[in-house]
Amino acid sequence: GAGCPLTVAIAGPVTVSGQHHTWLIPLLETGWVAYLSTTDAVCYHDGHRALDGYGGEPIYEVPIFGDDGALRESGTIRVTDMGFDEQVLLDQDRFLTACLLRPEFQKKMTGTELRHLLGGYYAAQEAKNGVTPGLLATCQRLSIPILVGAPGDGSVFLNAMKLWAMRQAGLLPSDGPSFDLDVAAEVFESCAYHHW
């Protein structure tokens, strides 16, 4: 296939483990990849290293067959053999919620547009904290769309659902945040790439 662009599908602890810096981002930078298909969790965990107050590396190795009860008691979240303080998730949620409240997110959009916009915010946060660019920032810079087949499998979309639920419960104004994920348009977008 000369002239045939690649589509790459990844899952698992790619960003939380830092593998994206080792092999995925270099692959994307070759220019051969038309789009990336992944999970919402991969996109969510991509932001942890750029959060304020963690010095660029809040994630550390833990025994994969260790005592999960003891980790839980200490407030440590485990993803395979990687661990981080539970506060990292809470800070990531605050960061995402702040992004989703910004004006450019207040419309109906595909997940590729959502992740492109988030990539810009991840990139700014990474630059601010001197962190190596992550997956969303790299895809945003290279204009590589990121498709997620199951947006509810991670907390990027769950933060959007939190805002929707708060609006429904009267905790936010009824004319408050209006982000709306257009799943049908994203399916058509994916089909268009395959047809191309």
What function would you assign to each model-found segment?
Residues 1-10, 16-196:
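Conserved catalytic alpha/beta core of Sir2/sirtuin-type deacylases, generalized to analogous enzyme cores
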